[in-house]
Amino acid sequence: MKACAYAKDLDYIDADINARIQDMRIVTKVSLSDEEAEFDGKSLTTEQMKVLLKYYETCQEPRRKEFLEMFFFAFHACGLRVVDVMTLQWSHINFDKKELRKIMIKTNKRHVIPLSEPAIRILRHWQEKRPDSKYVFNLVKEDLDLDNAEELYRCRNNATKCINQSLNVVGEQLGLDFSLSMHVARHTFAIVALNKGLSMTVVSRLLGHGSTDITEKVYAKFLPETLAAEVARISPELNQFVPTIQ
């Protein structure tokens, strides 16, 4: 795999071909069950997201601002898990196709995510900051061995703890009654997507869930807006068949 990446750097093989070869890499699956803990309803409302964005724009602490950029990237990258934000490489990004192609650490499956303009803007910003880096975000060492499960698990825990501690301070300053974390970005994306009418199947694929059963179990009970909207949409048809009650 390293030889293919080197060949790509020397323009011996096409970047798309290299990306597909890298997708074939078999890694030891890391136990990350705690990362997909039962959803407890902690997500940000539209107004809270606006307040958080305003906080970011006025933040004077460089590292905290970087963590907020990672939070917003995870949100705009279809709820990308923190471990995949942490291990995201420039080789996973195709700016021309506006997509992210990566083997997800938790599922060990190839996943393709369409990149929105906000996500691309964040990536371009980090590309300017770290033009010669392997990893997009400065959360792990450049020589991190993704095939070393223990090292990956340790790095994931350290990075998550560091980011979430900083985000939690932000949440407290904004008056949130729960801990702000990277996983909140994932849940917020899912809730927004479902309430905007995306099907459970589509959202499940974007989140990288193994099946829609997982998505339904976690999110279905938090979707009264979507259910009400769907009923309202078909009401004109249903109302044709109302019996006259005497």
What are these regions (language model features)?
Residues 1-22:
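N-terminal DNA-binding recognition helix of tyrosine site-specific recombinases/integrases
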Residues 114, 121, 126, 221-246:
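DNA/chromatin major-groove-contacting recognition/catalytic segments
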